[in-house]
């Protein structure tokens, strides 16, 4: 029981910080996408078709998620709020480097490590978002935090 209580306390401590991380990443990504595809980026077919589609319909499908949200929600703001965190991570794949990040990474994420190339910074962002996403899911699902590194 002590470990369960400790895990609950650790999860609560991480929750607010993880929410701020998610919002910061999401808002930076939205800023960059809007700069390239305009304020109605969620309806822009040119943008939609740049999103990855996993073969065999296995795993998270960012294109399908965006199309589903855009079809039922009236504004970009509502779409932004509804998209999964994995959607924002999917924008940091190599295929979006020249399209979005070469020209907008520094403005959207001014604190990035400038010792890195833009491609390295984008890759680092993807990897760090993956760590944040996994920790967030552990916290949200109340999985034991005392197993493995926090």
PLM regions: where:
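Amphipathic alpha-helical interface elements
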Residues: 1-150
């Amino acid at each position: 029981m002590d470990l369960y209580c400790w895990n609950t306390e650790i999860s609560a401590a991480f929750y607010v910080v993880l929410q701020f991380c998610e919002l910061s990443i999401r808002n930076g990504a939205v800023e960059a996408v809007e700069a390239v595809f305009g304020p109605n980026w969620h309806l822009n077919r040119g943008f939609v078709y740049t999103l990855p589609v996993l073969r065999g319909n296995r795993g998270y499908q960012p294109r399908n998620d965006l199309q589903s949200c855009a079809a039922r929600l009236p504004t970009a703001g509502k779409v932004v709020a509804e998209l999964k965190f994995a959607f924002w991570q999917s924008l940091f794949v190599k295929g979006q480097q020249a399209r979005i990040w070469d020209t907008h990474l520094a403005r959207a994420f001014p604190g990035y490590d400038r010792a890195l190339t833009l491609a390295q910074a984008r890759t680092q962002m993807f990897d760090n978002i993956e760590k944040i996403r996994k920790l967030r899911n552990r916290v949200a699902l109340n999985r034991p935090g005392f197993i493995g590194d926090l």
